[in-house]
Amino acid sequence: MRRQNSKIKIKNLGFTLIELLVVISIIGILASLTLVSYTGAQKQTRDTQRRSDLNQYRNALENYAGANNGLYPAGLDSMAALCGADNPLDTAFIASCPVDPLNAGGYVYGFFSSATGDAYLIYGGLETGGFWEICSNGKSGKVAVEPSSSACGL
Protein backbone atom coordinates (compact mmCIF):
# COMPACT_ATOMS: atom_id res chain seq x y z
CA MET A 1 0.00 0.00 0.00
CA ARG A 2 2.74 2.43 0.69
CA ARG A 3 4.06 2.07 -2.81
CA GLN A 4 0.80 3.08 -4.41
CA ASN A 5 0.53 6.19 -2.25
CA SER A 6 4.03 7.32 -3.19
CA LYS A 7 3.27 6.90 -6.90
CA ILE A 8 0.18 9.02 -6.59
CA LYS A 9 2.07 11.77 -4.80
CA ILE A 10 4.73 11.87 -7.50
CA LYS A 11 2.14 12.21 -10.26
CA ASN A 12 0.45 15.18 -8.52
CA LEU A 13 3.67 17.20 -8.17
CA GLY A 14 3.85 18.31 -11.83
CA PHE A 15 1.82 20.78 -13.92
CA THR A 16 -0.32 19.75 -16.85
CA LEU A 17 0.35 21.07 -20.31
CA ILE A 18 -2.90 23.06 -20.23
CA GLU A 19 -1.90 24.81 -17.00
CA LEU A 20 1.46 25.78 -18.46
CA LEU A 21 -0.14 27.11 -21.66
CA VAL A 22 -2.62 29.21 -19.66
CA VAL A 23 0.19 30.75 -17.58
CA ILE A 24 2.32 31.44 -20.67
CA SER A 25 -0.67 33.08 -22.39
CA ILE A 26 -1.34 35.33 -19.41
CA ILE A 27 2.32 36.36 -19.25
CA GLY A 28 2.26 37.14 -23.00
CA ILE A 29 -0.85 39.31 -22.66
CA LEU A 30 0.63 41.24 -19.73
CA ALA A 31 3.91 41.75 -21.60
CA SER A 32 2.13 43.13 -24.67
CA LEU A 33 0.04 45.53 -22.56
CA THR A 34 3.18 46.76 -20.83
CA LEU A 35 4.92 47.34 -24.16
CA VAL A 36 1.98 49.34 -25.54
CA SER A 37 1.83 51.60 -22.48
CA TYR A 38 5.61 52.07 -22.51
CA THR A 39 5.50 53.20 -26.14
CA GLY A 40 2.71 55.67 -25.35
CA ALA A 41 4.66 57.03 -22.40
CA GLN A 42 7.72 57.56 -24.62
CA LYS A 43 5.62 59.57 -27.09
CA GLN A 44 4.23 61.75 -24.31
CA THR A 45 7.72 62.30 -22.93
CA ARG A 46 9.03 63.45 -26.32
CA ASP A 47 5.99 65.74 -26.75
CA THR A 48 6.74 67.27 -23.34
CA GLN A 49 10.32 67.88 -24.51
CA ARG A 50 8.98 69.56 -27.65
CA ARG A 51 6.83 71.93 -25.58
CA SER A 52 9.86 72.72 -23.42
CA ASP A 53 11.97 73.43 -26.53
CA LEU A 54 9.30 75.76 -27.89
CA ASN A 55 9.24 77.61 -24.57
CA GLN A 56 13.02 78.10 -24.89
CA TYR A 57 12.38 79.69 -28.29
CA ARG A 58 9.64 81.87 -26.76
CA ASN A 59 12.01 83.09 -24.04
CA ALA A 60 14.72 83.85 -26.60
CA LEU A 61 12.26 85.75 -28.81
CA GLU A 62 10.95 87.78 -25.88
CA ASN A 63 14.53 88.62 -24.83
CA TYR A 64 15.28 89.60 -28.45
CA ALA A 65 12.23 91.89 -28.48
CA GLY A 66 13.30 93.42 -25.17
CA ALA A 67 16.63 94.37 -26.70
CA ASN A 68 15.10 95.59 -30.01
CA ASN A 69 12.36 98.09 -29.09
CA GLY A 70 9.71 95.38 -28.64
CA LEU A 71 10.10 93.97 -32.14
CA TYR A 72 10.73 90.35 -33.08
CA PRO A 73 12.80 89.20 -36.08
CA ALA A 74 10.68 90.40 -39.02
CA GLY A 75 9.49 88.59 -42.13
CA LEU A 76 10.86 85.13 -41.34
CA ASP A 77 8.94 82.04 -42.37
CA SER A 78 10.99 79.09 -41.12
CA MET A 79 12.98 77.86 -38.18
CA ALA A 80 15.99 77.62 -40.51
CA ALA A 81 15.78 81.38 -41.06
CA LEU A 82 15.52 81.98 -37.32
CA CYS A 83 18.38 79.64 -36.36
CA GLY A 84 20.34 79.48 -39.59
CA ALA A 85 23.53 81.20 -40.68
CA ASP A 86 22.09 84.71 -40.18
CA ASN A 87 20.75 83.69 -36.77
CA PRO A 88 18.95 86.71 -35.29
CA LEU A 89 18.79 84.78 -32.01
CA ASP A 90 22.54 84.73 -31.56
CA THR A 91 24.15 83.36 -28.42
CA ALA A 92 23.08 86.47 -26.50
CA PHE A 93 19.50 85.19 -26.59
CA ILE A 94 19.77 81.40 -26.95
CA ALA A 95 22.84 79.21 -26.50
CA SER A 96 21.82 76.78 -29.24
CA CYS A 97 18.61 76.20 -31.13
CA PRO A 98 16.86 73.08 -29.79
CA VAL A 99 15.99 70.33 -32.26
CA ASP A 100 13.25 67.75 -32.19
CA PRO A 101 13.92 64.82 -29.78
CA LEU A 102 13.62 62.26 -32.61
CA ASN A 103 15.73 64.28 -35.08
CA ALA A 104 13.80 62.58 -37.87
CA GLY A 105 11.52 64.22 -40.40
CA GLY A 106 7.86 64.69 -39.69
CA TYR A 107 8.20 66.24 -36.24
CA VAL A 108 9.89 69.57 -36.73
CA TYR A 109 9.63 73.03 -35.26
CA GLY A 110 8.24 75.87 -37.32
CA PHE A 111 8.37 79.65 -37.05
CA PHE A 112 6.57 82.57 -38.66
CA SER A 113 6.95 86.28 -37.97
CA SER A 114 4.98 89.21 -39.31
CA ALA A 115 6.51 91.51 -41.90
CA THR A 116 6.61 94.34 -39.35
CA GLY A 117 8.11 92.22 -36.56
CA ASP A 118 5.24 92.83 -34.14
CA ALA A 119 4.02 89.20 -33.99
CA TYR A 120 5.37 85.67 -34.21
CA LEU A 121 4.16 82.10 -34.01
CA ILE A 122 6.27 79.03 -33.21
CA TYR A 123 4.98 75.49 -33.36
CA GLY A 124 5.98 71.86 -33.30
CA GLY A 125 4.33 68.64 -34.45
CA LEU A 126 3.25 66.25 -31.70
CA GLU A 127 3.49 62.47 -31.88
CA THR A 128 0.20 62.21 -30.01
CA GLY A 129 -1.48 64.21 -32.79
CA GLY A 130 -1.83 67.85 -33.71
CA PHE A 131 0.59 70.71 -33.19
CA TRP A 132 1.71 72.71 -30.15
CA GLU A 133 1.54 76.42 -30.93
CA ILE A 134 2.97 79.40 -29.06
CA CYS A 135 1.92 82.91 -30.10
CA SER A 136 3.47 86.29 -29.39
CA ASN A 137 0.26 87.34 -27.61
CA GLY A 138 1.12 84.89 -24.81
CA LYS A 139 -1.29 82.13 -25.79
CA SER A 140 -0.13 78.56 -26.21
CA GLY A 141 -1.92 75.29 -26.80
CA LYS A 142 -2.69 72.39 -29.08
CA VAL A 143 -4.16 72.95 -32.54
CA ALA A 144 -5.28 70.37 -35.09
CA VAL A 145 -3.96 72.03 -38.27
CA GLU A 146 -0.36 73.00 -38.99
CA PRO A 147 0.01 76.80 -38.87
CA SER A 148 0.87 78.61 -42.10
CA SER A 149 1.38 82.22 -40.96
CA SER A 150 2.12 84.33 -37.90
CA ALA A 151 -1.63 84.62 -37.16
CA CYS A 152 -2.43 82.91 -33.86
CA GLY A 153 -4.82 79.98 -34.23
CA LEU A 154 -5.80 79.94 -30.55
Where are the regions a protein language model picked out?
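Active-site and glycan-interaction determinants of carbohydrate-active enzymes
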Residues: 130-138
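N-terminal leader/signal peptides at the extreme start of proteins
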Residues: 1-15
